[in-house]
Amino acid sequence: MKQLKPNSKYLLFGQALSFMGDYCVLPALLILSTYYHDYWVTSGVIAVRSIPMVFQPFLGVLVDRLDRVKIMLWTDVIRGVIFLGLTFLPKGEYPLLFLALLFVSYGSGVFFNPARLAVMSSLEADIKNINTLFAKATTISIIVGAAAGGLFLLGGSVELAVAFNGVTYLVSAFFISRIKLQYVPIQSENVREAFQSFKEGLKEIKTNAFVLNAMFTMITMALLWGVVYSYFPIVSRFLGDGEIGNFLLTFCIGFGGFIGAALVSKWGFNNNKGLMYFTVLSIVSLALFLFTPIFAVSVIAAILFFIAMEYGEVLAKVKVQENAANQIQGRIFSVAEASIGLCIAVGSMLINIVDAAVIMAFIVLLVSGLFLHTKLVNKSFSERNNESEQIHL
């Protein structure tokens, strides 16, 4: 940390605080959505968080033509003002305004990540250090953010958690305003070329079995994430008035992800042992989460679920990185980013359409299909490695 240059420190401090606020406010928003007594509003909260991701792959065209630091600065200011404004909205009233404000906030937020990644690439010698520190800060921020939200709720006001998120965005904007980078506009591809790149990513996914499997994994996990998020308010009711439970379940995201990241090297890549762990954990944890009336069991199930999701996420990314040409990987991840946003939204809507038993049956079929496809791909990977070894001999 001491070796980082000022620009790198400002970016890291601002983003750690901002991320902390994100995971402090998520359960708070789910709690506020329950005051509308309509689960379509709860699903709407998840949808307006995820649907803007569909457009993120095409925003690099605009980001490359503008000052990235200013994009980050004004995005955080807009988000901060909106979240502070949400605290003045009466509970349970004006649902469309509630969702519209969230959509504007998260919609503006999709400009932030491409700009942040571009700024990070300008940090030269610090780029490896800040990427490593950012990954560590992400997990810690989820845990601390959820804990802070829980404390605000115990203090008597869920609105404080929402206000805290607004403040973290404004503090992040302050740090970003201190970043001193020379603005150099880049004439990147136009919108038509961006769509062409997107189509090339789709073509690679369809013709490369390994990349297709990675995409299948990411889409499956996104649907599962949407389902789990939508059930947070229901499961939380098994603990007191249900509000503090949302923060405890959000804490599980960070805790489970931390354990999952640590288990990746032990479970391995492209082998049936890790695949079996992922499949069993995904199905069993979701079944427990959806059907148990005991909150302590739900917490354990949530931790197991997020362990599986972290493992699956790493596996999917590595599968793309190992089996696709470097120049096409960005296009593949662009397609993945858009698909993930759409699938989280779809998963969150299922609670309003079918009951838990039907959702669980769908999940079992989906994860089982992924298991079979991955097993075939792992076999191909093993055969390819054996052939490569024989050639070298």
Curated annotation (Swiss-Prot):
Which region is the signal sequence? none
Which molecular function terms from Gene Ontology are attached? Answer: transmembrane transporter activity
Output the InterPro entries linked to this UniProt entry.
Bacilysin_exporter_BacE_put (IPR022324), MFS (IPR011701), MFS_trans_sf (IPR036259)
Localization of this protein: Cell membrane
> What Gene Ontology terms describe where this protein resides (cellular component)?
plasma membrane
Q: Does Zinc count among this protein's keywords?
A: no
Residues annotated as transmembrane: 11-31, 43-63, 69-89, 92-112, 133-155, 160-177, 215-235, 244-264, 287-307, 353-373
One Pfam family name is MFS_1
Its membrane topology, per UniProt?
Multi-pass membrane protein
Q: Which SUPFAM superfamilies match?
A: MFS general substrate transporter
Q: What is this protein called?
A: Putative bacilysin exporter BacE
According to its UniProt entry, this protein's organism is Bacillus amyloliquefaciens
